[in-house]
UniProtKB/Swiss-Prot annotation:
A motif ('HIGH' region) lies at residues 99-109. It comes from Korarchaeum cryptofilum (strain OPF8). Catalyzes the attachment of glutamate to tRNA(Glu) in a two-step reaction: glutamate is first activated by ATP to form Glu-AMP and then transferred to the acceptor end of tRNA(Glu). It catalyses: tRNA(Glu) + L-glutamate + ATP = L-glutamyl-tRNA(Glu) + AMP + diphosphate. This is Glutamate--tRNA ligase. GO terms for cellular component: cytosol; protein-containing complex. GO terms for molecular function: ATP binding; glutamate-tRNA ligase activity.
Length: 569
């Protein structure tokens, strides 16, 4: 038991450092998540945890940091089984996540965040958050903030779950503040004869690139290209009338390498700069330049961008910039649910989804609203690893991890969906029922029953007949007398045995709490189950996650009307 005591003290210290004071319930939940084999000894654990919590709450911060440092070291060793990075030197690795603020981040963005973050921390390096905001037509200020909020929650969870600290980015960069610098680099390419302004229609450009045929603009004098470039910058061209192209090789086997466009005119207000700029770099130019200029040593991206690696390396070399490692990882898809914002946005705009935080979709805020703990997402992607193989995710895999996190800490409540009234013959009110707050706790919650009738779920009567026996949780055994469409007649059983009797949840009729349970099914459908719960439902805080007995884990979404969202069973 000595190693368990040591673990309890470490977890209590970690909790105290994070929240200012250690909490017994939180520490118990964490240790049961890490050591599920200890569930059977929970009664012995509780006094040990209470003692540890009292002790660490009296310790100075320096002592707590010493204890927690050991915990993080152990967790960090666990993560080291990830493959080594090529050409990586400890203390000098710089990685980044580079989201475009054009929507709310999804589960797919979580992988793009966590893979480079984990590697940066494993190598005691630096991690950057860089907003790729050079397409103003689809970018909004609200998306910058959403990305900051959701990414912050995941990185904090990464520190808690994997011991990788600090659980935040080291520097934030906004690409659009570097546009003038990128204009100078573009001019440098033109002056070196490595780029030219093309005014061919977009369809003609696509056709010629496919066939490997250059256009007349390719051989324009440098002076002409500089003149046209200034005209682009000064508003002389409308959107689509001109773009700056990189001069490469029109016969290159990779079509992406055939004189790609690197700057274009976009006539849209930028969320930060308004109408100050109208010429913006394409992704290949901005990502290659910014990765080099900001010191990135290892740039991770989804392997869908692999055909663009040649272009990006060419840009870096043409400008004489510092080169870096480009590493691809596999994409993820979610079984039966679209991840792409181009699929989700129309569903939001049409009203099919109530917003980007709709619990039916795998946006990060949708998952959090559904009751998925950020630690579950971190653990899932850690187990998945940085593989280059594409993966199809079944949400049950994440639910399984989430269940292990919630089960030790979520209090149990009774909720009766689709209720039917049941009268109990032989029950003399008032009666005080005692129900478990949690299977691993001695605590009980009292429910006062002032009448001889309760609500039970209509589904619990399926297949039953008069004479069959049930047990109302924490109350009494009953025998079915009769079943009608709108009412059931029960009587108190002569024998009050527990074993071998089906135990069901119930709610008082007089003081039961009306509640709704939102059950996500697909991006296009859901079920809203109405019902009644025990009186204690009134005390649940908004955002709190509980377990409805025999129903599943649920998060309180709003208080008026009392509405829960089903996380999973």
């Amino acid at each position: 038991m000595e190693d368990v005591k040591e673990l309890i003290v470490r977890l209590a210290a970690e909790n105290a450092l994070k929240y200012g004071k250690a909490d017994t319930k939180a520490v118990i939940g964490k240790i049961l998540y890490m050591r599920p084999d200890l569930k059977q000894n929970v009664r012995e654990l509780i006094p040990l945890v209470e003692e540890a919590v009292r002790a660490v709450n009296e310790m100075p911060k320096e002592a707590l940091e010493g204890i927690v440092g050991e915990v993080k070291k152990e967790k960090k060793e666990e993560v080291r089984k990830w493959p080594d990075l090529p050409k990586a030197e400890r203390g000098k690795v710089v990685t980044r996540v580079a989201p475009e603020p054009n929507g709310y981040p999804t589960l797919g963005h979580a992988k793009g965040l966590l893979v480079p973050f984990i590697y940066a921390r494993l190598y005691d390096g630096k991690f950057l958050l860089r907003f790729e905001d050079t397409n103003p037509r689809v970018e909004r200020l609200e998306y910058y903030e959403a990305i900051r909020n959701e990414f912050s929650r995941l990185l904090e969870a990464c520190e808690e779950e994997l011991g990788l600290s600090p659980g935040r980015w080291d520097e934030e960069i906004i690409e659009s503040y570097h546009l003038e610098e990128m204009y100078s680099l573009a001019k440098k390419l033109i002056e070196a004869g490595k780029a030219y302004v093309c005014t061919c229609p977009a369809a003609e450009v696509r056709k010629r690139r496919k066939l490997g045929i250059s256009c007349d603009h390719r051989d324009q004098p440098i002076e002409k290209n500089l003149e046209l470039w200034e005209k682009m910058l000064n508003g002389g061209f409308r959107e689509g009338e001109a773009h700056l192209r990189l001069k490469t090789d029109m016969s290159h086997p990779n079509v992406t390498m055939r004189d790609p466009g690197i700057f274009r005119v976009i006539e849209a207000e930028h969320p930060i700069h308004g109408d100050k700029y109208r010429v913006y770099p394409v992704y290949d130019f901005s990502v290659s330049v910014m990765d080099s200029l900001t010191g990135v040593t290892h740039a991770f991206r989804s392997k869908e961008f692999e055909p663009h690696v040649d272009v990006q390396r060419h840009i870096v070399r043409a400008l004489g910039l510092r080169e870096y490692e480009m590493i691809q990882f596999g994409r993820i898809t979610v079984e039966g649910i679209p991840l792409s914002k181009r699929y989700i946005r129309p569903l939001v705009e049409s009203g099919i989804l109530e917003g980007w935080d709709d619990p039916r979709i795998p946006t990060l805020r949708g998952l959090f609203r559904r009751g998925i703990n950020p630690r579950a997402i971190v653990r899932f992607f850690y187990e998945l690893g940085p593989s280059k193989v594409d993966a199809t995710v079944n949400m049950e895999a994440i639910a399984s991890i989430n269940r292990k996190i919630l089960d030790p800490i979520a209090e149990r409540y009774m909720f009766v969906p689709n209720p039917i009234k049941a009268k109990i013959e032989g029950l003399t009110p008032p009666v005080i029922a005692q129900v478990e707050v949690h299977p691993d706790s001695k605590r009980k919650r009292e429910i006062r029953l002032d009448e001889s009738e309760v609500f039970i779920a209509s589904s619990d009567l399926e297949g039953l007949k008069p004479g069959d026996e049930l047990r109302l949780r924490g109350l009494v055994n009953v025998t079915i007398r009769s079943v009608n469409p709108d009412e059931v007649s029960l009587r108190v059983s002569e024998e009050q045995r527990v074993k071998g009797v089906k135990i069901i949840q119930w709610a008082p009729v007089r003081n039961g709490v009306p509640a709704r349970l939102f059950v996500p099914e697909s991006p296009y459908s859901f079920r809203m189950l109405g019902g009644y719960g025990e009186p204690a439902l009134r005390g649940i805080k908004e955002g709190e996650i509980v377990q409805f007995v025999r129903v599943g884990f649920a998060r309180l979404d709003r208080r008026d009307p009392l509405t829960f969202i089903l996380s999973h069973d």
